[in-house]
């Protein structure tokens, strides 16, 4: 990994107040983003911008991954669900934060991306990440309940199944909307859901039975 490039990017994110937690900084410094994108795009791996990975999908900008990890309040040992694996990069960053005692389940609906992300994550040694082929809008009951759930595509609202699979005290982070999207944070407290608007964002659409 080109250390100078990633150090520069992370330094800018810290200076701009995007990331503050040392665990998030360490994870972003550790995960080799260039391994998760097409070889033809590798020279752009450490530019803080979304990049196309094929099939109409993107790998999120580094700052967005950092913001989402911060807002999820991730910690060691947590059980996490990701809806929308894409390249697998975001799941790898989360895996670094929750550690070997934590678990990350990530669901991808596009078979080619499922196969590629699964292969890369295995090659890089992320044994606590399980990649599942399926409709992420239904969640993944088998590994629930989850301490944290995040969605990497924007839907009309958050699928009910995700709230049902969330532990009490758990957090869901998801972009909501079609053309104009808002990153929303939901917290489940004693069975009730409390929501908070965070910032305006732009994600690919959430496709599935409970999406678009």
From Swiss-Prot:
Disulfide bonds: none annotated. The keyword Cytoplasm applies. Pfam families: PCMT (PF01135). GO terms for cellular component: cytoplasm. It comes from the Archaea. The active site is at residue 60. NCBIfam families: pimt (TIGR00080), PRK00312.1 (NF001453), PRK13942.1 (NF010549). Belongs to the methyltransferase superfamily. L-isoaspartyl/D-aspartyl protein methyltransferase family. Catalyzes the methyl esterification of L-isoaspartyl residues in peptides and proteins that result from spontaneous decomposition of normal L-aspartyl and L-asparaginyl residues. It plays a role in the repair and/or degradation of damaged proteins. This is Protein-L-isoaspartate O-methyltransferase.
């Amino acid at each position: 990994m080109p250390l100078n490039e990633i150090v520069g990017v992370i330094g800018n994110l810290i200076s701009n107040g995007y990331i503050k937690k040392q665990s998030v900084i360490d994870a972003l410094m550790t995960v080799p983003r260039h391994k998760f994108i097409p070889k033809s795009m590798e020279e752009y791996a450490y530019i803080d911008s979304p990049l196309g990975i094929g099939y109409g999908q993107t790998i999120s900008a580094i700052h967005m991954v950092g913001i989402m990890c911060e807002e999820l309040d991730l910690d060691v040992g947590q059980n996490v669900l990701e809806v929308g694996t894409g390249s697998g990069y975001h799941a790898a960053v989360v895996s670094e934060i929750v550690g070997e005692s934590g678990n990350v389940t990530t669901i991808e609906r596009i078979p080619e991306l499922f196969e590629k992300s699964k292969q890369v994550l295995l090659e890089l040694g992320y044994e606590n990440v399980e990649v599942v082929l399926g409709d992420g809008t239904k969640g993944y009951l088998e590994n629930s309940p989850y301490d944290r759930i995040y969605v990497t595509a924007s839907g009309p609202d958050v699928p009910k199944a995700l709230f049902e699979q969330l532990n009490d005290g758990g957090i869901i982070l998801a972009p909501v909307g079609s053309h104009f999207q808002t990153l929303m944070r939901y917290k489940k407290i004693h069975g009730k859901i409390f929501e908070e608007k965070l910032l305006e964002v732009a994600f690919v659409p959430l496709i599935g039975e409970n999406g678009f």
